[in-house]
């Protein structure tokens, strides 16, 4: 498994990783970025209104992205990247700037959450309880893909709550599919897809942290050693 992860790391652009090292140095030196929308591309809306950099994301907000669009925002000590063609509902006390979780109706979300702050991600087929975790989720009607990139998460099937698993990882070891109605098995093993260490380094850097796998990249000049 370790060799498989190393081969996957090689597939990540060395240039992208190098750029994130530089970004992380600057982020840690400057401190955390301002809360709210940090970066966006394409058609991004919050409650139907076109989003702008600096806009707050509050509990109760609905974030949507169009084709070839994405948005990255910071809330509390958490950072969230929503990919194209997504609908995500921010959860928590009405109007709060610190969220208790996200409901991912459709689309893909990569997020990092501060240690010691339980959060819940929900999709049409899964409820995911997370604790200081980096996690990538793709929500479809028929199934949910979840990669706990590092940390601990409780995966529970919406269709059969007795089908559950606690996943503990340090570097993408146990991706899962959580299936919808009619599937013979509710939780199934899955490959690592559609997200990179570079993105996780960037997200953690925005909130002044480093991901636990950071030591896998010992120097900026030697990014292909795995």
Task: State the predicted function of each range.
Residues 8, 12-18, 23-59, 66, ...:
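Flexible, surface-exposed loop/linker segments and immediately adjacent secondary-structure boundaries
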